[in-house]
Amino acid sequence: MTSLSVLSCKLLFKLAITSHCELYSFFPLVCYTIFDFEDHDLSNWTLNGTAFSNQPTYGDNPSERLKNDPTRKEPSKHQGHWWIGTYENRSSPSHPAGEKQDDEPQGSMTSPGFLIDANFLTFLIGAGCQNFETRAELIVDGDVVFETNAERHHHSCMETMFEKKWNVSGFTGRQAQLRLIDHSSGDWGHINFDHLQACHKLP
């Protein structure tokens, strides 16, 4: 790195500089993404059963399969292009939009480990809300410390995802995993999930 480059880093950012001009701010990002499925790759995840075999899902598949039902306007509201939806069967852009695998398949998917280094985890969740047979879990050092389904204030299930959060400030510095569960084949027996973030404070 030239002396001019180093000087530029110092003047523009007033931050510590490594040999690669890697910058460490005194004001870190409020939130950063842990898992968003945009790499379309679950090879590092542990899959059990068949519910997650066709995942992740591409695009707003619920809107396409519900387009002829005027009583249900339930866009997925996912982030980016890819997300998890165990009712859906669209695992590539070339696959016909609107295809589904229904509620019958069951299974789980467990993430690789990650370090908790923020106060909150936020995520998008939707679909199954009637019981905890479909849920998201946070596992810390092998124990389930949080679990949630897609229950809303009005107690009705929807494909549309909305944000929930876990306060993980008591687990800072510990290793964690995310586990998604679909153990239901009944009505609303599926889970939608996307965009797990770590947040130092809530935006």
Segment roles from a protein language model:
Residues 105, 184-201:
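Extracellular carbohydrate recognition
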Residues 37, 121-127, 176-182:
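Extracellular beta-strand-rich recognition modules
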Residues 122, 131-138, 191:
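Beta-strand acidic-aromatic groove motif in beta-rich domains, primarily in extracellular
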Residues 84-120, 162-165:
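Short beta-strands within extracellular/lumenal beta-sheet-rich domains
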Residues 140-176, 181-190:
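Extracellular carbohydrate recognition and processing domains
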Residues 27-64:
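Extracellular carbohydrate-recognition regions
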Residues 117, 127-134, 186-188:
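Extended, low-complexity, turn-rich repeat/linker tracts enriched in Gly/Pro/Ser/Thr and Asp/Glu
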